[in-house]
Amino acid sequence: MTSQRTRERLIQRLCEEGIANQRVLDVIRKTPRHLFVDEALAHRAYEDTALPIGHNQTISQPYMVARMSELLLAAGPLDKVMEIGTGSGYQTAVLSQLVERVFSVERIKGLQDRAKERLVELNLRNVVFRWGDGWEGWPALAPYNGIIVTAVATDVPQALLDQLAPGGRLVIPVGAGEVQQLMLIIREENGFSRHVLGAVRFVPLLNGPIA
């Protein structure tokens, strides 16, 4: 269920779906997604689907992890990325192998604690975690070259725009209920450019930390 052949089938599917960044594909190939889900779901870890991780949250579909990572890296290497929504830690693990430093914010402490353990097990040590409200970001360590949000916001949080460095890229799902769109926002010299990239389905970005 976690064989190399199973992983290669996933990579082939991602390629067929349009993922072209070889670094992203290589990292997803070698990142053990089965370690980021409950043992009872490990046999489904390399399916291209979201899976429940408890607390009414999910581990994102591999295609969406690849797509969002690819969008973030499209302008070149990044040294400082903020992730909103640590969740299982899978997207965090992928990012940590693609950029120099990851600053990950999660509101549910139980999820974040387990994600920390997984990244330590994988010897991924360029990630710093914050337990807090994702709507606020992490202003004390701003600005960031890239920001990735793994839950849907009803609107783009102004705090995240404020924390984006010049030329920085924000990848975020925006909308409510059934109507959600993936957006790429780039901080330009005279403001922000916004690009709508298609329909998606994410859990909501909620306020307030939970112990």
UniProtKB/Swiss-Prot annotation:
GO terms for molecular function: protein-L-isoaspartate (D-aspartate) O-methyltransferase activity. The keyword Lyase does not apply. The keyword Cytoplasm applies. This is Protein-L-isoaspartate O-methyltransferase. It catalyses: [protein]-L-isoaspartate + S-adenosyl-L-methionine = [protein]-L-isoaspartate alpha-methyl ester + S-adenosyl-L-homocysteine. It holds the Pfam family PCMT. It comes from Pseudomonas syringae pv. tomato (strain ATCC BAA-871 / DC3000). It comes from the Bacteria. One of its GO terms (cellular component) is cytoplasm. Its main location: cytoplasm. Signal peptide: none annotated. Its EC number is 2.1.1.77.
